A protein has these predicted regions:
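N-terminal beta-alpha supersecondary unit
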Residues: 1-60, 89, 93, 212
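Short Gly/Thr/Asp-enriched flexible loops that form oxyanion-binding sites at enzyme active sites
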Residues: 56-81
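Short, well-ordered alpha-helices that flank and scaffold nucleotide-derived cofactor binding pockets
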Residues: 74, 78, 96-100, 149, ...
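A short helix-loop
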Residues: 4-6, 105, 112-113, 120-209
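Conserved phosphate-binding catalytic cores of ATP/NTP-utilizing and phosphoryl-transfer enzymes
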Residues: 86-109
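Short beta-strand segments
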Residues: 55-57, 88, 109-114, 121
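A short glycine/serine-rich beta->alpha loop
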Residues: 18-24, 56-63, 130-135, 181-185
């Protein structure tokens, strides 16, 4: 199996807010899903009746966006007779690695970083997992978004910070790293975010590229 076509909508509507606004996200889902489906079918040169199954995220995630996606998928299923499968969005992130790495065998350890989640899982076999550790506060993505806002950068924060960090000196500033203790598999990003905030207030002349690095 393989991914034959993928289409992603941009998140520019959230940029001025510095993060995802749930109400706006759900409205954008409702508006863009029909167009994105048409684009996918057009690019693949197939019709909807040639689709064998519809998979849709049923959670976890923002309630409004989930409802928009599930409602759209159910409508397609009822109208076409194509069966529908509800997908756990975190499980999907785990299993997509098998598509990209054919040599990946069970068991394996997966670092799952998605939206509000930063977790470390032991994947024993299909459907069997053990949570080894997770963030105690902010997820990595949230920390990037908040960090970018502190630095006056755009949204989403991760790519914006990465872009300027490549131009900076990563050895110049030593920000603290939390929970760096042997045997501890959990994460914490709130302390790093706070350190960044105070550093920027006290060192306004420091090159922003070096701070990001």
């Amino acid at each position: 199996n393989e991914i034959v076509f993928s289409k992603v909508s941009n998140q520019i509507i959230h940029e001025k807010y510095g993060g995802v606004v749930p109400e706006l996200a759900s409205r954008e889902h409702e508006k863009l899903l029909p167009t994105m489906l048409r684009d996918c079918l057009y690019q693949l040169k197939i019709s909807l009746i040639e689709v064998d199954c519809i998979a849709v995220t049923q959670g976890p995630g923002l309630a409004g966006s989930l409802i928009a996606g599930v409602s759209f998928a159910k409508g397609l299923s009822l109208g076409s007779g194509i069966p529908i499968i509800g997908i756990n969005h975190l499980e999907a992130h785990i299993y997509v690695n098998i598509l990209s790495d054919r040599d990946l065998d069970f068991p394996f350890v997966c670092l799952l970083v998605s939206g509000g989640h930063t977790q470390l899982w032991l994947v024993k076999e299909l459907g069997k997992y053990t949570l080894l550790g997770q963030t105690r506060d902010d997820a990595a993505g949230e920390a990037f978004d908040k960090g970018a806002r502190i630095l006056g950068l755009g949204y989403p924060g991760g790519p914006e910070i990465e872009k300027i960090a490549k131009k900076g000196n990563s050895d110049l500033i030593n920000f603290p790293r939390a929970l760096m203790v042997k045997g501890n598999l959990e994460f914490s990003f709130s302390g790093l975010k706070t350190s960044l905030l105070y550093y920027c207030k006290e060192n306004k002349k420091t090159n922003i590229n070096d701070i990001a690095a």
